[in-house]
C-alpha cells in the first residue's frame, strides 16, 4: 500500500475539517439533551422565535388542522390513522368509517376485521384498527360521561401519544399545545429553534421560546410552511418569509 504524501494528507485533513464544520452536532449534556444556552442566548433566540411566529402567521393566516372531523372522537381516530400516512388519504377513508361507526360505542362493538378492511389504505392497519377499537372502548367506558380534556387522561387511551393528544387539545379544546409532526420537526431544526431529534424534547424547546397562547397557531403555521415551502429535499428559499432568520438558508 502506498503512503500518502504530506500534500495529500493535508488535503484530506482539510476536507474532513470542512465536513465536520458543516455537520457539527449540537453539544449534548450528560443526560443526552442539547447543552443549555446562556441566559442571553436564550433571550435572543426567544425574540427570533417570536418574530418567526409572527411572520409565519402572516404568511399562512388559513393554517389549520387538515384532518376532517366533526367531534373530538373523530379527530382522535383520524389522528391515529394519520401516523405514517398523509392527511389526504385519511380524509378519503374516514367518511365511510364514521358513517358505519359514528360513535365510540359503535366503534367499540365493531368487528376488528371490518375496521381493518376500511382503513387498510392508511397503512399499518392491524395496529391502527386495534388502537382505534381500544380507544373507542375506553371512551365508551371510563370516559362515557365526557371526553378527556387533559393530556394525562388522553395518554391513557390506546394508540394515543403526545402528538395525538396535543392535536386534540389544541384543535378541540383551545388548550395551548405544540404538535411535533414530521414537518414541525424538520422546520424548527432548520431555522434553529430546536436542536434535539426527540419529539418530546423539541416540544419543550419550542414551548420555552413562545407564549402558550401562540403554541397551537404556531404548530399549524410551521406545518403549512413545511408542506408549501420548506420541503424536505428542496426548500424554496427564494419565497421563504423567514429566510433571513433561518440557520439553514444556504442549504
Mark where each language-model region is.
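Catalytic cores of DNA base-excision repair glycosylases
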Residues: 37, 41-251
